From Swiss-Prot:
Record's protein name: Integrase
Short name of any one Pfam family annotated for the protein: Phage_integrase
Domain (Core-binding (CB)) ranges: 73-151
Single GO term (MF): transferase activity
Domain Tyr recombinase as annotated: residue spans: 171-362
Function, in words: Integrase is necessary for integration of the phage into the host genome by site-specific recombination. In the presence of host integration host factor (mIHF) forms a specific intasome complex with attP. The intasome subsequently binds attB and forms integration products. mIHF probably stabilizes a sharp bend in the DNA during integration.
Domain of life of the organism encoding this protein: Viruses
Similarity comment: Belongs to the 'phage' integrase family.
Keyword Cell wall biogenesis/degradation tagged: no
Keywords on record: DNA integration, DNA recombination, DNA-binding, Hydrolase, Transferase, Viral genome integration, Virus entry into host cell
Subunit structure: Forms a complex with host mIHF and attP DNA (phage attachment site). The complex binds attB (bacterial attachment site) to form products.
The organism of origin for this protein: Mycobacterium phage L5
Length: 371
C-alpha cells in the first residue's frame, strides 16, 4: 500500500487501484466503494473525502451512497416495499395499502423519498379536506410510519410528518339497560338476534363475533366460555380473517349464564345446516358469515325504538363492560375481558359505573324523603 500525505492507495492484482483513509474523527479506515483504473481518479476521491472532513460535512461513504441511490426511489416504491417487509397482520396490511392507494400515492407517490419535506406533507394534509376525518388521520399515520422507517434507514435526517393532530373526540355513550337491550334485540332479525346479546354481554368486537365458530365454544353445561382467537374484517370487497387485534385480544370470555342459555338454544335451533366444528356461530339464513350491513340495518331499527338513533354497533360493547364494572370487576379484569392492552377504556367504564352508583344513591334518598 503506497503511503501518501493523506490516505492510501493500493494496487490490486488486477492492476486496479483501491483508495482508503483513516478518519481522524473516529479512527476507522474507510474504503472507496469502487476501485479505479488510474491513480489520478483515486487521488481525486481521497481529496474529496478530505475536503468533506475539513468542512465538517462528512458522513460515511456507504451512507452517502445509500442516500444517493434512495434519491431515485419514489415514495410509492418505498411504501410498497415497506408494506411487504413490515411485520403486519394480513388485514392491517390490506388496510394500510388501501389508505396508501387512495390518499398517498395519487398526490405524493412520484415524489422522491429524499425530497419529502414538512411543507409537502402540510399541503397534502390540507388537500385531503375535512370530509372524512378518520380516513384522513389513518392515511397520515401510515405516511408517518413509513417516514419513520426512512429515518431509521438514514434516507432522510428527520421525519417530515410533524402535524399536530387533535385527538378524535371521544364519545361518551350511556350504556343500554338490560330492558333497553331487550327492546333493541326484538327488532333484529330472529335468525341472528343472538348477536346483539353476545356483543352486549360479552363485549366482543363485531369482527370477533362473526369469526366465532362452534369449535371456539367451551361449554360443560354449567359454564360457557368463548375462545376469542381470530377476527374478520372487510377490506375493500373482500373479507380478511386474521389473528385477533392484539396479543391481549386472544382471550377466553366467560358468558353470563342467562346469555349462555340463549346461545345453547340458538345452536340447537338456528345452526341446523352446519353443525361441524368449523361452522359459524352466527350466520345469515343461508349459513353464510353475518355481514355488518345486514346486522346494522335491523340494529338501527331497535336503536330508533328506544330513542337512541345515534348509537353504533360498537356501543354494544359498553353494555357488558359497564355492568362488569358495576359487578365489581377490577381494571385488570376489565382489560382482560375486553381484550385491551391499556387501562384507559377499562377505567372509563369504571368511572361510568361509579357515576351510575351515585345516581342510584340519590334516587334512593329521594324515596326515603317521600316515604
Amino acid at each position: 500500500m503506497a503511503r501518501r500525505g493523506w490516505g492510501s492507495l493500493k494496487t490490486q492484482r488486477s492492476g486496479r487501484i483501491q483508495a482508503s483513509y483513516v478518519n481522524p474523527q473516529d479512527g476507522v479506515r474507510y474504503y472507496a466503494l469502487q476501485t479505479y483504473d488510474n491513480k489520478m481518479d483515486a487521488e481525486a476521491w481521497l481529496a474529496g473525502e478530505k475536503r468533506l472532513i475539513e468542512m465538517e460535512t462528512w458522513t460515511p461513504p456507504q451512507d452517502r451512497a445509500k442516500k444517493a441511490a434512495a434519491s431515485a426511489i419514489t415514495l410509492e416504491e418505498y411504501t410498497r416495499k415497506w408494506l411487504v417487509e413490515r411485520d403486519l397482520a394480513d388485514g392491517t396490511r390490506d388496510l394500510y395499502s388501501g389508505h396508501a392507494e387512495r390518499r398517498i400515492y395519487p398526490v405524493l407517490g412520484e415524489v422522491a423519498v429524499t425530497e419529502m419535506t414538512p411543507a409537502l406533507v402540510r399541503a397534502w394534509w390540507a388537500g385531503m379536506g375535512r370530509k372524512h376525518p378518520t380516513a384522513r388521520r389513518h392515511a397520515y399515520n401510515v405516511l408517518r410510519a413509513v417516514m419513520n422507517t426512512a429515518v431509521e434507514d438514514k434516507l432522510i435526517a428527520e421525519n417530515p410528518c410533524r402535524i399536530e393532530q387533535k385527538a378524535a373526540d371521544e364519545r361518551d355513550v350511556e350504556a343500554l339497560t338490560p330492558e333497553e337491550l331487550d327492546i333493541v334485540a326484538a327488532e333484529i332479525f330472529e335468525h341472528y338476534r343472538i348477536a346483539a346479546y353476545i356483543l352486549a354481554w360479552t363485549s366482543l368486537r363485531f369482527g370477533e363475533l362473526i369469526e366465532l365458530r362452534r369449535k371456539d365454544i367451551v361449554d360443560d353445561g354449567m359454564t360457557m366460555k368463548l375462545r376469542v382467537r381470530r377476527g374478520a374484517s372487510r377490506v375493500g370487497n373482500k373479507i380478511v380473517v386474521g389473528n385477533a387485534k392484539t396479543v391481549r385480544s386472544k382471550r377466553p370470555v366467560t358468558v353470563p349464564p342467562h346469555v349462555a342459555e340463549m346461545i345453547r338454544a340458538h345452536m340447537k335451533d338456528r345452526t341446523k345446516m352446519n353443525k361441524g366444528p368449523e361452522a359459524f356461530l352466527v350466520t345469515t339464513t343461508q349459513g353464510n358469515r353475518l355481514s355488518k350491513s345486514a346486522f346494522t340495518k335491523s340494529l338501527k331499527r331497535g336503536y330508533a325504538k328506544i330513542g337512541r338513533p345515534e348509537l353504533r354497533i360498537h356501543d354494544l360493547r359498553a353494555v357488558g363492560a359497564t355492568f362488569a364494572a358495576q359487578a365489581g370487576a377490577t381494571t385488570k379484569e376489565l382489560m382482560a375481558r375486553l381484550g385491551h392492552t391499556t387501562p384507559r377504556m377499562a377505567m372509563k367504564y369504571q368511572m361510568a359505573s361509579e357515576a351510575r352508583d351515585e345516581a342510584i344513591a340519590e334516587a334512593m334518598s329521594k324515596l326515603a324523603k317521600t316515604s
